[in-house]
C-alpha cells in the first residue's frame, strides 16, 4: 500500500468514502485508466468528509482494508492513505490533498482528479472548488444520456466550459482508447484554462447506500423483507461487491 503516488507518472486521485468499495468504483477507475492511459489510479478513502458531518458507517481502517481487498491484484490500482484522518480531527479537503500530491510529483508527472457524476454535481459545495480543476484536471464519469447542460450548470461559480474539438492527450493518441472520452476546456475569470475529461454513458446502477441496505436485509423484493442470507446472496449473484470485500464485511460484521 503506497502512501504517496509514484513520481513522474500519469496519476488519477480517486477519493471517496468507499463505505464499502464496490464494482461501480472499479468500473469508473477502469474506464478512466483505459481512456486516458493512466499509469495509476489512487484510491484514497477519506478520513472526515466536510459535507458528511454524520461520518461514515464503517471506520477508516475497515474502509482502507476493504478498498485494499477490492483493488488487490489489479494492475495500476493502488490504495493511498493521503486522505487519512488528521490528528486534529479536522475535515479532509480535496483541494489541500491535491496540492500535496501535486507537490510530490516529479517533473513530467501529471495529476488528475477522478470522480463520479454525483460528486461532480455537488462540486459547488466543496471548499475553494473553483481552484480544483486547475490543480488537477477533472475526469468525470457521467450517466447515459446525461445532458451537457447539467454539467455546465454544475460548474463552480466563475468557471465556464467549452468543447475542445480534436483534443486528445498525447499518450492516448498513440493507441485507440478502450473507452470513449470527451474533452473540454474549463476557463476561469483570470483567463486560465484547464482540460476536463468526460467519460460518457458509463452505466453504473449501484450505490454504497444500496449495498449497505442489502447487507442489512432492508430491501423489499415485492413479497417481503429479504433475509440476511438472501441479501448477501443477491450481492454475490449480481457482482455488486468483489468477493473478498463481501467476505471481509461478513467476518467483521459490518453494516448490520
Predicted regions and their residues:
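Nucleotidyltransferase catalytic core that binds NTPs
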Residues: 1-256
Amino acid at each position: 500500500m503506497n502512501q504517496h503516488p509514484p513520481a513522474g507518472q500519469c496519476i488519477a486521485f480517486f477519493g471517496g468514502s468507499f463505505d464499502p468499495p464496490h464494482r461501480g468504483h472499479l468500473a469508473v477507475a477502469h474506464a478512466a485508466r483505459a481512456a486516458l492511459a493512466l499509469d495509476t489510479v489512487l484510491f484514497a478513502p477519506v478520513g472526515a468528509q466536510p459535507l458528511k458531518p454524520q461520518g461514515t458507517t464503517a471506520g477508516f481502517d475497515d474502509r482502507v482494508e476493504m478498498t485494499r481487498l477490492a483493488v488487490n491484484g489489479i494492475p495500476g490500482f493502488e490504495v493511498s492513505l493521503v486522505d487519512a484522518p488528521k490528528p486534529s480531527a479536522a475535515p479532509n479537503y480535496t483541494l489541500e490533498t491535491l496540492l500535496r500530491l501535486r507537490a510530490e510529483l516529479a517533473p513530467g508527472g501529471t495529476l488528475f482528479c477522478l470522480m463520479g457524476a454525483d460528486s461532480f454535481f455537488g462540486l459547488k459545495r466543496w471548499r475553494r472548488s473553483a481552484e480544483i480543476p486547475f490543480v488537477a484536471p477533472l475526469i468525470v464519469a457521467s450517466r447515459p444520456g446525461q445532458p451537457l447542460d447539467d454539467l455546465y450548470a454544475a460548474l463552480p461559480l466563475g468557471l465556464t466550459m467549452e468543447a475542445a474539438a480534436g483534443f486528445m492527450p498525447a499518450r492516448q493518441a498513440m493507441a485507440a482508447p478502450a473507452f470513449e472520452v470527451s474533452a473540454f476546456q474549463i476557463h476561469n475569470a483570470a483567463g486560465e484554462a484547464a482540460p476536463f475529461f468526460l467519460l460518457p454513458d458509463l452505466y453504473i446502477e449501484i450505490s454504497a447506500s444500496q449495498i449497505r441496505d442489502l447487507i442489512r436485509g432492508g430491501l423489499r423484493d415485492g413479497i417481503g423483507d429479504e433475509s440476511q442470507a438472501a441479501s448477501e446472496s443477491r450481492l454475490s449473484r449480481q457482482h455488486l461487491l468483489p468477493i473478498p470485500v463481501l467476505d471481509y464485511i461478513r467476518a467483521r460484521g459490518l453494516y448490520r
